[in-house]
Amino acid sequence: MMKLNLFINANETESYIDIHAPKMNDHVQSIINAVNDLDKSHTLVGYIDKEIHIINVSDVITFQVINKNVTAITSNQKFKLKLRLYELEKQLPQHFIRISKSEIVNKYYIEKLLLEPNGLIRMYLKDAHYTYSSRRFLKSIKERLSI
């Protein structure tokens, strides 16, 4: 059971969080990730032709580079973004995983994984398509998915 203490002090110049734990474990790490995600962007601006759309980041299945443009793919739309993939990666919550030079996936939309004989991971996503990880990102993917 986790204990929570809140201290309100008008003399404090900024808000901060201290975590006290007997050891680092998955529960503590998930709290750290949740706190870090508070500063991350939860909406993005995307474009379809000349229309401007506000996209909820949690609705995005994957971000892919298509024809040198970063594209946010949801279950029913594809939006062009004006960000580079590396810029986007810094803004996204922890549940987005870089799987290749040209793709970032939302781990909540990963349905299953297939380890290929060549060492790559084939990721089946909930929108009924699949994608491949690159070997360069394999170690990071395994760590982020705890496999």
UniProtKB/Swiss-Prot annotation:
Alphabetized InterPro entries for the sequence: LytR-like, LytTR_DNA-bd_dom
One cellular component (GO) term of this entry: cytoplasm
Places the protein is found: Cytoplasm
Keyword Cytoplasm set for record: yes
PROSITE patterns found in the cross-reference section: HTH_LYTTR
Gene Ontology MF term list: DNA binding; phosphorelay response regulator activity
Official protein name in the record: Uncharacterized HTH-type transcriptional regulator SAR2449
Keyword list, A-Z: Cytoplasm, DNA-binding, Transcription, Transcription regulation
Lineage: Bacteria, Bacillati, Bacillota, Bacilli, Bacillales
SMART domains per UniProt: LytTR
UniProt keyword DNA-binding, yes or no: yes
Cysteines paired by S-S bonds: none
